[in-house]
Amino acid sequence: MAHLDPADALWRPSNQMGVLNTDLAKQLGAATMGARLWRLAPGQASTRHRHRETTELYVVLEGTGRLRVDDELLTIATHGAVLVEPRSVRQPFNDTGAEQLWLVAGAPPEPANTLAMTAEELAWLYPDGPRALPPELGGGELRRAEGPESEQAV
């Protein structure tokens, strides 16, 4: 068993979008899953991304969540949850006036160090680039993912 006191959790801004998050799974030594808390301030978005193998569970712990999965835009009440399958393009964002706190858990884990990825890996992971904002936050039109590896995406 492992335990993490909230006061001891290490929070940092994400590499791409600067969203404050804490990697619970890493701090607890979990090897077979990933789990993070993400705190989105008004006007912030996480990356629009996809995973090859990871299924992710998105749970809104505080606030009203907004999540785009492929072409579907969802509004998620506090304690609401969405399960997102691999290869689906997803992006949580905050176009409300209040902070949001998300729990995002997934399995199996995939490498998350975007600073060590090749340009090809980054292009697949982020079909609109690593810092694309959703239209609701002033971003451009969303592109559809292309290529043989994205048959189930978008």
Residue ranges and their predicted role:
Residues 21-23, 36-51:
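Conserved short histidine dyad/triad with adjacent acidic residue
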Residues 44, 53-54, 72, 88-89, ...:
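A generic "binding-loop/recognition-motif" signal
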Residues 83, 97-114:
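A short hydrophobic beta-strand segment most commonly corresponding to one strand
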Residues 48, 67-68, 84, 90-96, ...:
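Short beta-strand His + acidic residue motifs that chelate non-heme Fe in jelly-roll/DSBH
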Residues 29-31, 41-44, 64-66, 108-111:
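Short, charged/polar surface micro-motifs in flexible loops or helix N-caps
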Residues 1-33, 117-154:
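A short, N-terminal "cap"/entry segment at the start of jelly-roll beta-barrel domains
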Residues 71-87:
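Short acidic-glycine-tyrosine-enriched beta hairpin
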Residues 53-55, 59-65:
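Glycine- and acidic-residue-biased ligand/ion/polar-headgroup-sensing regions
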